[in-house]
Amino acid sequence: MTHKSVRDYIRTIVDFPHEGILFRDVTTLFADPRGFRIAIDQLLAPYAGMRFDKVAGLEARGFILGGAVAHQLSTGFVPIRKKGKLPGRTISVSYQLEYGEAVVEVHDDAIQAGEKVLLVDDLLATGGTAEAGIKLIEQLGDQVVGCAFVVDLPDLGGRRRLEAMGMEVHALCAFEGL
């Protein structure tokens, strides 16, 4: 019996959302019970024995992964959302996109000062969204003790960007190219 790797469950869609882009679609991983289980287990493996107070997930696929990881750790989950999507008082961080700027927010009471947080998302590209999420968590007086991703796109430099911030970065697989 041949065992599939996490990478084998991820579909590539050519020219989406723009011509020349190879979109790494993790929804096929999420849809497969075995693949999804393998991914969650492997996201947790590097952190075995570590204590986390919260898991934070980046919108939107980071919510799916982060919720499952938080469940496995028996800890709380904190969504980091696009501006205007959270109902309570928030803090925000803006970051640069290829063409313009984006803003992410978190509730100002979602994480208590001094808590240890694991940041989770599906894909690490340039690292801009993850960096903004880390800054939000740090503004609340907390420590990001790890950043876990299913896919790393190393050609876009996100891992280097986060490691330059002193972050420990873990990805289950990498895809070269755009």
Curated annotation (Swiss-Prot):
Subunit structure, interactors included: Homodimer.
Source organism (scientific name) = Cereibacter sphaeroides (strain ATCC 17029 / ATH 2.4.9) (Rhodobacter sphaeroides)
Which CDD domains does the protein's record reference? PRTases_typeI (cd06223)
Q: Can you cite an annotated GO cellular component?
A: cytoplasm
GO BP: any one term: purine ribonucleoside salvage
Q: What is its biological role? A: Catalyzes a salvage reaction resulting in the formation of AMP, that is energically less costly than de novo synthesis.
List the PROSITE patterns hit by this protein, alphabetically: PUR_PYR_PR_TRANSFER
What is its subcellular localisation? Cytoplasm
Pathway-wise, it operates in: Purine metabolism; AMP biosynthesis via salvage pathway; AMP from adenine: step 1/1
Q: Which UniProt keywords apply?
A: Cytoplasm, Glycosyltransferase, Purine salvage, Transferase
Q: Which cysteines are joined by disulfide bonds?
A: none
> PANTHER family annotated for this entry?
ADENINE PHOSPHORIBOSYLTRANSFERASE (PTHR32315:SF3)
Name of protein: Adenine phosphoribosyltransferase
Q: What is its EC number?
A: 2.4.2.7
Which GO molecular function annotations are given, in alphabetical order? Answer: adenine binding; adenine phosphoribosyltransferase activity; AMP binding
Enzyme kind, highest EC tier: transferase
A Pfam family annotated for this chain is: Pribosyltran
**Species lineage, top-down?**
Bacteria, Pseudomonadati, Pseudomonadota, Alphaproteobacteria, Rhodobacterales
- Family, per the entry? Belongs to the purine/pyrimidine phosphoribosyltransferase family.
Catalytic activity as recorded in UniProt: AMP + diphosphate = 5-phospho-alpha-D-ribose 1-diphosphate + adenine
